[in-house]
């Protein structure tokens, strides 16, 4: 499935010295998002910073949303993850995409202009409504919570 999403360039470096979001491989699920800053930025241990991407998107289709996810290598090797863990982009949002970057390590981390810092994945959305009931139809699990369906 392929869908076209509107993208607005907010900084003239996008598409020039800083590439547009792109899939790294044919099998990539996420588009790489890059930092749109003018000079290197130090992120101190345990510090959270909000990084601009220089782009805005408009999904428009209410049956589609996007999530901003961390890049696995940055998290595993450098302790760089998203400050909000996952960023949700609603279909009607039109503002700049920004990345909440949290350095959970004990070392300073340098973010350079154009660095790939997160990834954008588009996901289907099902909007629902609720039916208020007094009792649920019985299920095999019932009210079993944490750990009730197996060891892990």
Swiss-Prot record:
Signal peptide: none annotated. SUPFAM superfamilies: dUTPase-like. One of its GO terms (biological process) is dUMP biosynthetic process. Gene3D superfamilies: 2.70.40.10. It is an enzyme of class 3 (hydrolase). PANTHER family: DEOXYURIDINE 5'-TRIPHOSPHATE NUCLEOTIDOHYDROLASE. Belongs to the dUTPase family. This is Deoxyuridine 5'-triphosphate nucleotidohydrolase.
